Regions:
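Surface-exposed, low-hydrophobicity beta-strand/loop segments enriched in small/polar/acidic residues
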Residues: 1-128
Length: 128
Protein backbone atom coordinates (compact mmCIF):
# COMPACT_ATOMS: atom_id res chain seq x y z
CA UNK A 1 0.00 0.00 0.00
CA UNK A 2 1.32 3.43 -0.95
CA UNK A 3 0.35 6.66 0.85
CA UNK A 4 0.78 10.09 -0.74
CA UNK A 5 1.15 12.74 1.97
CA UNK A 6 -1.09 15.17 0.05
CA UNK A 7 -3.92 12.61 0.18
CA UNK A 8 -3.80 11.73 3.88
CA UNK A 9 -6.69 12.47 6.20
CA UNK A 10 -4.89 11.45 9.41
CA UNK A 11 -1.28 10.64 10.28
CA UNK A 12 -1.15 8.93 13.67
CA UNK A 13 -3.99 11.19 14.83
CA UNK A 14 -4.76 10.74 18.53
CA UNK A 15 -8.46 10.27 19.25
CA UNK A 16 -9.61 10.80 22.81
CA UNK A 17 -12.92 12.46 21.84
CA UNK A 18 -15.04 12.91 18.71
CA UNK A 19 -13.06 14.78 16.04
CA UNK A 20 -12.72 15.44 12.33
CA UNK A 21 -9.65 14.20 10.49
CA UNK A 22 -6.59 16.43 10.74
CA UNK A 23 -6.66 17.05 6.98
CA UNK A 24 -9.37 17.78 4.42
CA UNK A 25 -8.90 16.79 0.78
CA UNK A 26 -9.93 19.34 -1.85
CA UNK A 27 -11.25 17.58 -4.96
CA UNK A 28 -10.99 20.78 -6.99
CA UNK A 29 -13.23 23.40 -8.49
CA UNK A 30 -16.79 22.81 -9.62
CA UNK A 31 -17.34 21.32 -13.07
CA UNK A 32 -14.12 19.37 -12.77
CA UNK A 33 -13.59 16.35 -14.99
CA UNK A 34 -11.76 13.65 -13.11
CA UNK A 35 -13.09 10.96 -15.42
CA UNK A 36 -15.77 8.31 -15.04
CA UNK A 37 -13.44 6.37 -12.81
CA UNK A 38 -14.09 3.95 -10.03
CA UNK A 39 -14.31 4.14 -6.27
CA UNK A 40 -11.29 5.88 -4.73
CA UNK A 41 -9.24 3.41 -2.62
CA UNK A 42 -9.15 4.39 1.05
CA UNK A 43 -7.27 2.98 4.03
CA UNK A 44 -8.34 3.72 7.62
CA UNK A 45 -6.44 1.84 10.30
CA UNK A 46 -5.41 1.83 13.94
CA UNK A 47 -1.73 2.73 14.29
CA UNK A 48 -1.58 2.55 18.11
CA UNK A 49 -3.92 0.47 20.29
CA UNK A 50 -6.82 2.36 21.90
CA UNK A 51 -7.56 2.36 25.62
CA UNK A 52 -10.29 3.88 27.76
CA UNK A 53 -13.02 4.51 25.22
CA UNK A 54 -16.06 2.34 24.44
CA UNK A 55 -16.16 2.51 20.62
CA UNK A 56 -15.31 4.50 17.49
CA UNK A 57 -17.42 5.05 14.37
CA UNK A 58 -15.77 6.45 11.22
CA UNK A 59 -17.70 8.49 8.64
CA UNK A 60 -16.65 9.79 5.21
CA UNK A 61 -18.11 13.28 4.84
CA UNK A 62 -18.30 15.74 1.97
CA UNK A 63 -19.28 19.39 1.67
CA UNK A 64 -19.04 22.26 -0.80
CA UNK A 65 -17.50 24.39 1.98
CA UNK A 66 -14.14 23.61 3.59
CA UNK A 67 -15.58 24.50 7.02
CA UNK A 68 -18.09 21.60 6.68
CA UNK A 69 -21.05 23.66 7.89
CA UNK A 70 -23.46 21.30 6.10
CA UNK A 71 -21.45 18.09 6.01
CA UNK A 72 -23.07 15.12 4.30
CA UNK A 73 -22.08 11.61 5.42
CA UNK A 74 -21.69 9.37 2.36
CA UNK A 75 -20.64 6.16 4.12
CA UNK A 76 -19.84 5.13 7.70
CA UNK A 77 -18.78 2.14 9.76
CA UNK A 78 -20.80 0.66 12.58
CA UNK A 79 -19.52 1.50 16.07
CA UNK A 80 -16.35 -0.59 16.50
CA UNK A 81 -15.87 -1.78 20.11
CA UNK A 82 -12.68 -1.17 22.08
CA UNK A 83 -11.73 -4.87 22.02
CA UNK A 84 -11.21 -4.61 18.23
CA UNK A 85 -9.28 -1.32 18.25
CA UNK A 86 -5.78 -2.77 18.42
CA UNK A 87 -2.78 -1.68 16.32
CA UNK A 88 -3.22 -3.04 12.80
CA UNK A 89 -7.04 -3.07 12.83
CA UNK A 90 -8.50 -1.84 9.52
CA UNK A 91 -11.91 -0.14 9.47
CA UNK A 92 -14.29 -1.59 6.89
CA UNK A 93 -14.52 1.39 4.54
CA UNK A 94 -12.22 0.52 1.66
CA UNK A 95 -13.11 3.34 -0.73
CA UNK A 96 -14.70 6.73 -1.17
CA UNK A 97 -17.86 5.91 -3.14
CA UNK A 98 -18.35 7.21 -6.68
CA UNK A 99 -20.71 10.13 -6.98
CA UNK A 100 -19.36 12.10 -4.02
CA UNK A 101 -20.43 15.57 -5.13
CA UNK A 102 -18.94 17.99 -2.62
CA UNK A 103 -15.64 19.68 -3.33
CA UNK A 104 -14.16 18.76 0.06
CA UNK A 105 -13.86 15.34 1.72
CA UNK A 106 -12.88 14.51 5.30
CA UNK A 107 -13.29 11.74 7.84
CA UNK A 108 -15.16 12.17 11.09
CA UNK A 109 -14.35 9.97 14.08
CA UNK A 110 -17.21 9.57 16.57
CA UNK A 111 -15.78 8.44 19.90
CA UNK A 112 -18.01 7.01 22.63
CA UNK A 113 -16.48 7.09 26.09
CA UNK A 114 -13.28 8.80 27.16
CA UNK A 115 -10.21 7.62 25.31
CA UNK A 116 -6.81 7.77 26.99
CA UNK A 117 -4.62 6.46 24.16
CA UNK A 118 -4.80 5.33 20.55
CA UNK A 119 -4.15 6.73 17.07
CA UNK A 120 -5.38 6.28 13.51
CA UNK A 121 -3.84 6.64 10.08
CA UNK A 122 -6.06 7.25 7.05
CA UNK A 123 -5.79 8.35 3.46
CA UNK A 124 -6.37 7.70 -0.20
CA UNK A 125 -3.99 4.94 -1.21
CA UNK A 126 -2.74 2.91 -4.12
CA UNK A 127 -2.38 -0.84 -3.86
CA UNK A 128 -4.74 -1.99 -1.10
Amino acid sequence: MIFDSTNKFSTDQALTATAASTNVIDLGVANRNIGVGENIPLYIGVSATFTGLTSIQVSVQTDSDEAFGTAVTVVQTPAIPLASLKAGYQFNIDSVPRGVLGRYVRLNYTVVGTGTAGTVVAGIVAGI
